[in-house]
């Protein structure tokens, strides 16, 4: 183990000088030794500048760091605990416990920089994963072992949707989950921990947090820490759920690190290595012949612009995209999923079956027609429409309201109990609305209910 000294500190970027014959490799973890608040601070090598000097990024706060401090090279990249010992625990980017519940007591550690599985090892599956959320199961069904993105601007419900998915899938699926909190609010991490504890699934979840107040190096690597833990479970032959909230903060941390390292920015100020950094992470989130990783990633959309380079780069890697719309949220329809913008590779008659495909297609057709008629209604009013168009509008408004659903995780705010709707009930409900079976029921009855039977019951009560 070679030792060096700190020669320059600029914020989170630290230059360290080593003897010429013992220069650390890129991604090696270095540790600061000696007195003071920085004792034990981990640095990750990013560049070799020549002359024995390496440029590193600090994985913690660099307050109190000064020139001349001694640095020890660990000789390998950052490694984190893996295996069942991590379940029920909250860890940071280095795998250290931050839940005040003692040491992890792991039997094995993995380095966080690993290569993706080869083509021969990867498996292809078309098994569906039921979420219990009507709009998702109908329009953008998830595949087991697939990648899902929840796209949305600020405050349209990405985290609430993700919490509901964890609540529904983690409980029903009874598999293991890994939650990586990347650059999000500490309060949300705290809420998530107690939510899991109260629902009794804490012993099946490993949590890794690198919150908003952490330095960029920490936020850039915390997603890899969570992924490494999920990979271990997958390689043991288990089916794992990996939740990442929020993948945009991973990109943003990369932008900060890139700027600190002096790289020339690319479009909209993002790092020139954006596509490669995203690829390195996403290519590792895959299912092998041994086990599967099903990942759900929240993607913040800056200024609600889906063409922004960050969400646009993420799109390419996903099997299903759930787009949350501010317009739908403003109508009071939650989850605010846009059924016309959301997509899934699984929505294919060969995968979901002909009936499901036809119903989903019918719902989208009716909603699209209603969207086109909105301008005419705004100018001329409903009376000018043909009888057929009036029928379309009436059914579309019922469908819109029926796409809403009370969530278990939002019971505290809404006061109404959450509903889990099976795929069979979802298809039956929408098929009935499209066929005109429920034309006699007022549209208000479809708002915030679970299955179609509840809507009928609600309408009968109002009579």
Curated annotation (Swiss-Prot):
GO terms for cellular component: plasma membrane; proton-transporting ATP synthase complex. Keywords: ATP synthesis, ATP-binding, Cell inner membrane, Cell membrane, CF(1), Hydrogen ion transport, Ion transport, Membrane, Nucleotide-binding, Translocase, Transport. It catalyses: ATP + H2O + 4 H(+)(in) = ADP + phosphate + 5 H(+)(out). It comes from the Bacteria. It is an enzyme of class 7 (translocase). PROSITE patterns: ATPASE_ALPHA_BETA. It is a peripheral membrane protein. CDD domains: ATP-synt_F1_beta_C (cd18110), ATP-synt_F1_beta_N (cd18115), F1-ATPase_beta_CD (cd01133). SMART domains: AAA. PANTHER family: ATP SYNTHASE, ATP SYNTHASE SUBUNIT BETA, MITOCHONDRIAL. Belongs to the ATPase alpha/beta chains family. This is ATP synthase subunit beta. It comes from Shewanella sp. (strain ANA-3).
